UniProtKB/Swiss-Prot annotation:
Function: Antimicrobial peptide with potent activity against bacteria. Acts by fastly disrupting the bacterial membrane. Shows activity against Gram-positive bacteria S.aureus (MIC=1.5-2.9 uM) and S.epidermidis (MIC=2.9 uM), M.luteus (MIC=23.4 uM), B.thuringiensis (MIC=2.9 uM), B.subtilis (MIC=2.9 uM) and Gram-negative bacteria E.coli (MIC=5.9-11.7 uM) and P.aeruginosa (MIC=5.9 uM), as well as against penicillin (MIC=2.9 uM) and methicillin (MIC=1.5-2.9 uM) resistant bacteria. Antibiotic activity is not affected by major negatively charged components of the prokaryotic cell wall (e.g.
UniProt family annotation: Belongs to the non-disulfide-bridged peptide (NDBP) superfamily. Medium-length antimicrobial peptide (group 3) family.
Subcellular location: Secreted; Target cell membrane
Keywords for this protein: Amidation, Antibiotic, Antimicrobial, Cleavage on pair of basic residues, Membrane, Secreted, Signal, Target cell membrane, Target membrane
Lineage: Eukaryota, Metazoa, Ecdysozoa, Arthropoda, Chelicerata
Organism name: Olivierus martensii
Protein name: Antimicrobial peptide marcin-18
Length: 78
């Protein structure tokens, strides 16, 4: 009877440790799968944000108005 109780305690302890370690390593794996791609994406996003900023500057409405004003001032009636 004592031997069965010891086996049961060992089995339950092993079961808890395995489940906890599985949950722990599963959580680490989830974090790794989210962090690792984001490291590679940052380089692309930086260049993309620079390109986006260049496009915003290129098509900035205030900039267009300044150029339009400059061109209109060249006309004699403006």
């Amino acid at each position: 009877m004592q031997f069965k109780k010891q086996l049961m305690v060992i089995f339950l302890a092993y079961f808890l440790v395995v489940n906890e370690s599985e949950a722990f390593f599963g959580h680490l794996f989830k974090l790794a799968t989210k962090i690792i791609p984001s490291l590679f994406r940052r380089k692309n996003q930086r260049s993309r944000s620079i390109m986006k900023r260049d496009l915003e500057n290129l098509f900035d409405p205030y900039q267009r108005n300044l150029e339009l004003d400059r061109l209109l001032k060249q006309l004699p009636n403006y």
